[in-house]
Structures are given as structure tokens and as C-alpha cells.
Amino acid sequence: MNINKLLKQAQKLQEEAKKIQEQMASLSFEGESGGGKVKATVNGEGFLLKMHVDPTLLEAKDNEMIEDLIVVAVQAAQEKAKEASQSQFQKLGGNLGIPGMF
């Protein structure tokens, strides 16, 4: 493989990676905990966009439980975003003929 071909392939990879990042940022992923009483929505980069806590949980006044449920819901949403991102980057590596790149 000559250097020019390698450089073109690297440039193409960089452009495609940027497109994937932009697409992922525009997507949203939801995680939940407590049987759906706590829901978190993150974008494809894992940033928290929205949080919903069922008012009945707030009435219980069990702050530690609520905090734990929030953490679990956010982590679940972030994990979904991470899996989607990894899937897209794996496809990118496969499309460029670079198996196992991501």
C-alpha cells in the first residue's frame, strides 16, 4: 500500500468519524430505573438532556433511594448511547476494510 493511498484512507476515516459524531449528538437514548419511575434521556455523546422522577417517589422522601435510581437511569441511558456509538464506529472500520479497528 503506498503512502498516498494510506493518507486518503485516513482522511476518509476522519471525515466519516466526524459525520458519525455529529449524527450521534443529534440522537437521544432513554434509560430507566425503579420500574420506569425514574427516566433519563441522554444524547449520543452521553450528555444528560432530560430527567423525569415520578412524583410518588418524591413523596416517599427517601433521598438516598431516589439518588440511586437517578444514577442507574442515567447510566442505563449512557450505556445505550455508548453501544450505539460503538456499533456505528465498528461499521465504519468494516466499510474501510479495517477489521477490528474499533
From Swiss-Prot:
SUPFAM superfamilies: YbaB-like (SSF82607). The keyword DNA repair does not apply. InterPro entries: YbaB-like_sf, YbaB/EbfC. Keywords: Cytoplasm, DNA-binding. One of its GO terms (molecular function) is DNA binding. It is found in: Cytoplasm, Nucleoid. GO terms for cellular component: bacterial nucleoid; cytosol. It holds the Pfam family YbaB_DNA_bd. Its main location: cytoplasm. Binds to DNA and alters its conformation. May be involved in regulation of gene expression, nucleoid organization and DNA protection. Homodimer. Belongs to the YbaB/EbfC family. This is Nucleoid-associated protein Minf_1672. It comes from Methylacidiphilum infernorum (isolate V4) (Methylokorus infernorum (strain V4)). The lineage of its organism: Bacteria, Pseudomonadati, Verrucomicrobiota, Methylacidiphilae, Methylacidiphilales.
